[in-house]
């Protein structure tokens, strides 16, 4: 049984461009659609320094940067081919992310987007995997970038800074090139790159790394056409709600496909003004929202929780906020209810996707909000649910692994044909299906629309005496206890070598006032009263100061499972290194 978008969703245009770069598709389209009075309206806003760029200013900055980099790196402008050029952006969020990306694209190159929280070892590994030959970074990350680049053989001359003068210098010996200086001294502007027919689908615009929550990180190749397709899918789905330009906030890492595609590029394509902000404290975030009167927030569940804790949101005028999108990890229904209690006018929407899918697969619609679901399928997306025996589901409410086909699918994994073949399956009609690894079910809402519900990661399912236990099910129950701020459930063997659900708990303020033993007893009693015996927790509840998470908010269960049994005491604490 193949599932598609609801009938009321407009169809996806059949003529998606296959010879157009991202920059040309988005900025030229926005520029052409602007009226004379809108030409001077900024579309990019730096949330920290206040700098703003119009479409024309952004494209001019990109062209001059491309010309300067071409001369500095000896990278002539030419269509992508065997001489593949890759530059890494290892930086906090900044408006120059787009100038750098599009400048490298004009040279026929690809951007490897690397998370700013990476250590030198992690950065080294990702530079090697992506074959990067240059790095764009900032003052605060320069030492890490230097260490990793020296290990992989990237010359110091190929490290570029996005910050103003006054940056870190090792003994003031090496004069690192700064983006502003390259733009200022460029003698001309390099034009847009003209791709040949079909090159949009075969040319990687970005290398984004999969989350690595259930294994080693893999470099995912996202093509120009694939990203364009996902942008069009999202905006086609949302067309009926659009009422003119919006102001959106991008605080999620641009190195992650959720922040890059769903937030930034989709907002720019809509004609929104996009405020770009590095990851910062909640107070700074809320101050920017209040100051710029941000209408749409794109968050991850952990950031939502931080905003609501301690009454922080109540100290700011947030009446400008109309809707909040969450993605990257499931939003617990109780957290959604908490938001609506404090901000009843906000529309809470979830979206679901994967880097390998080109990002978004489903989004919540204004016309059918259903708490707990991650929305309806986007136009152009086909989905099927495959059970453990290999058969497809034939009705609603049956769970299994989600397989997705979409024009936005990634090209595959870089230099890993085995992983690509395993994850991207081609059927007997020649159609490619992405095996997501997520256990899901599709249910009919009271309004008659098909909604996607995430059950859990298949690899995270716990098997107890032959029965399957979804960690998310227990986590949602445990979160209903007032003593719990956050919780993660993984598997652990008991004394009889049987798997049992193991709870890792971050206590709330109320919970911190109670003895750990009393909190543990309360949690055991709750599960025993509400769940079947095979779902009962392992006797030891592990209390931690924080849960290890990816930047998108996903709990890193693998890190929790790797904790040694010696640490599995009621009063144990997670190492600060996790």
Curated annotation (Swiss-Prot):
Residues involved in ATP binding: 210-218, 350-355, 438, 457, 554
GO CC entries: peroxisome
InterPro entries associated with the record: AMP-bd_C, AMP-bd_C_sf, AMP-dep_synth/lig_dom, ANL_N_sf
Motif Peroxisomal targeting signal type 1 location, chain numbering: 576-578
A molecular-function term among this protein's GO annotations: ATP binding
Disruption phenotype: Abolishes the production of AF-toxins and their precuror 9,10-epoxy-8-hydroxy-9-methyl-decatrienoic acid (EDA); and impairs the pathogenicity. Does not affect growth rate, sporulation, and spore germination.
Region (SBD2), start-end ranges: 351-413
Database matches in PANTHER family: BCDNA.GH02901, LONG-CHAIN-FATTY-ACID--COA LIGASE
Annotated protein name in UniProt: Acyl-CoA ligase AFT1-1
Upper lineage: Eukaryota, Fungi, Dikarya, Ascomycota, Pezizomycotina
Gene: AFT1-1
């Amino acid at each position: 049984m193949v599932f598609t978008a609801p009938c009321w969703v407009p169809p996806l245009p059949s003529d998606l461009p296959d010879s157009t770069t991202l920059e040309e598709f988005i900025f030229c389209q926005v520029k052409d659609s602007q009226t004379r009075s809108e030409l001077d309206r900024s579309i990019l806003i730096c949330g920290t320094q206040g700098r703003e760029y119009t479409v024309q200013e952004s494209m001019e900055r990109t062209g001059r940067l491309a010309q300067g980099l071409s001369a500095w790196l000896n990278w002539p402008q030419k269509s992508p081919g065997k001489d593949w050029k890759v530059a890494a952006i290892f930086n906090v969020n900044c408006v120059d992310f787009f100038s750098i990306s599009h400048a490298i694209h004009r040279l026929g190159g690809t951007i490897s987007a690397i998370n700013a929280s990476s250590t030198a070892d992690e950065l080294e590994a990702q530079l090697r995997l992506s074959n990067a030959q240059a790095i764009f970074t900032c003052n605060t990350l320069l030492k890490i970038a230097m260490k990793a680049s020296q290990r992989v053989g990237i010359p110091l001359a190929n490290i570029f800074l996005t910050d103003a003068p006054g940056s870190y210098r090792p003994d003031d010996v090496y004069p690192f090139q700064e983006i502003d200086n390259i733009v200022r001294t460029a003698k001309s502007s390099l034009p847009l790159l003209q791709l040949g027919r079909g090159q949009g689908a075969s040319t990687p615009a970005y290398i984004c790394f999969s989350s690595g929550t259930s294994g080693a990180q893999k470099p995912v190749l996202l093509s120009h056409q694939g990203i364009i397709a996902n942008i069009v899918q999202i905006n086609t789905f949302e067309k009926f709600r659009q009422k003119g330009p919006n102001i959106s906030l991008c605080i999620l890492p641009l190195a992650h496909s959720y922040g890059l595609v769903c937030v930034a590029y989709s907002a720019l394509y809509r004609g929104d003004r996009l405020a770009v902000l590095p990851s910062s404290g909640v107070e700074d975030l809320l101050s920017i929202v209040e100051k710029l009167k941000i209408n749409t927030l794109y968050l991850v569940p952990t950031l939502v929780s931080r905003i609501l804790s301690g009454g922080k949101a109540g100290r700011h005028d947030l009446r400008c906020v109309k809707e909040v999108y969450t993605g990257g990890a499931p939003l617990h229904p109780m957290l959604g209810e908490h938001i609506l209690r404090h901000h009843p006018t906000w529309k809470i929407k979830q979206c679901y996707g994967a880097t390998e899918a080109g990002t978004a697969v489903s989004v919540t619609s204004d016309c059918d909000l259903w708490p707990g679901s991650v929305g309806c399928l986007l136009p152009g997306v086909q989905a099927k649910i495959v059970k453990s025996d290999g058969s497809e589901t034939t009705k609603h409410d049956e769970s299994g692994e989600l397989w997705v086909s979409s024009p936005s699918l990634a090209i595959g994994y870089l230099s890993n044909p085995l992983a690509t073949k395993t994850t991207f399956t081609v059927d007997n009609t020649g159609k490619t299906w992405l095996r997501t690894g997520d256990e899901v079910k599709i249910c009919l809402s009271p309004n008659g629309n098909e909604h996607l519900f995430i059950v859990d990661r298949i690899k995270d399912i716990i098997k107890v005496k032959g029965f399957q236990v979804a960690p998310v099910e227990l986590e949602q129950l445990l979160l209903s206890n007032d003593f719990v701020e956050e919780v993660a459930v993984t598997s652990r063997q008991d004394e009889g070598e049987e798997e049992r659900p193991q709870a890792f708990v971050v206590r709330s303020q109320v919970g911190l006032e109670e003895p750990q033993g009393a909190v543990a007893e309360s949690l055991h009693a709750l599960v025993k009263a509400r769940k079947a015996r095979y779902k009962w927790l392992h006797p030891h509840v592990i209390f931690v100061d924080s849960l290890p998470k990816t930047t998108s908010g996903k709990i890193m269960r693998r890190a929790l499972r790797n904790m040694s049994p010696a640490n599995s005491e009621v009063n144990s604490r997670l190492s600060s290194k996790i």
